[in-house]
Amino acid sequence: QKLSTLLEVEDLVVDIPVPSGILHPVREISFHVDYGETLCIVGESGCGKSLTSLAIMGLLPNAASRNAKQLNLEGESLLEIPESALADLRGDKLSMIFQDPMTSLNPSYSIGNQLGEVLMRHRGATRAAARDRAVYLLEKVGISSAASRLGQYPHQLSGGLRQRVMIAMALMCEPRLLIADEPTTALDVTIQAQILLLIRSVQKEFNIGVILITHDLGVVARVADRVAVMYSGQIVETGTAIEVFEKPLHPYTQGLIDCIPIPGKTKPGEQLGSIPGIVPTLVGDLSGCTFRDRCDFAQNECADDVGENVLGAGRQFRCILPAELGSRKELVAVQ
């Protein structure tokens, strides 16, 4: 583990018993996050992105089980510490911005109470000190007249303001790792851009490692340092944002990128790209590449277990075919 590594995840597995068997929503995924770095985990709904974040936070549903070879924050295993110690970490070194700002804040408590509680709980701060910190951070996240907002309740704020409050709350104790689970989903496009810029600026200022979970490749292009592409509970490709966008190595990543309209290039009314087929079930025994039934490059060998190909530091993809997409097309042509 490098000195610059903040979070190290190796072979993380999440299993959930369901009436038809065992659901495997997260299957042996590995990644790391460095200090001051943004890792975007991208994939469609149901691929296991949010459960990955909940597994790191220790907030999985009671029925779910979590296992991993390594799950370390600043060298300390999150698998071996008791729940009370994990509760001390959450909101302190480890913070999360949840998906829907409309329902993430408690409607019964004022903004000031909810912000202050974090610092008082983890730092033993006085109410006055917590109030000062809350005002400072509300101003930092772009909320005007911050002191007057402390007495307001969530229903008195717009969605964009509520999400800014959630970001301020996550920053109250100067966390080392911030997990943002689709933080712009419920917001309009203009506010989305503001929130992304805000997360980026506070990350650089406080040297926070960020895991940004999203299904929006536009968000990824805007803020990611590195990208992990998830499909059916597995990470199928990792690399820097530039590497993944300019030279995708997994057919699923290529399919996602082909779905994006390009201003000035995509003609009005032109049919957009799509990925045929449906996502397979993750219940029961799974083998081979789960994307094979939807893949243009599928081979008989895809039904066998597919390992990770490592091209260099931080550049991997899970496919039996060569990295050069042109070579794949030649293979398909001769079939």
Segments predicted by a language model, with ranges:
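ABC-type ATPase nucleotide-binding domains, specifically the catalytic core motifs of the NBD
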Residues: 16-20, 58-63, 80-81, 86, ...
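ABC ATPase NBD coupling module
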Residues: 23, 60, 78-95, 113, ...
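P-loop NTP-binding/switch modules centered on Walker-like glycine-rich loops
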Residues: 58, 179, 183, 187-270
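Conserved ABC transporter NBD signature motif
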Residues: 65-77
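Conserved ABC ATPase "signature" region
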Residues: 76-77, 129-148, 257-258
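A short, proline-enriched helix->beta-strand linker immediately N-terminal to the Walker B motif
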Residues: 172-176
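Charged, flexible cofactor/metal-binding loops and thiol motifs
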Residues: 240-335
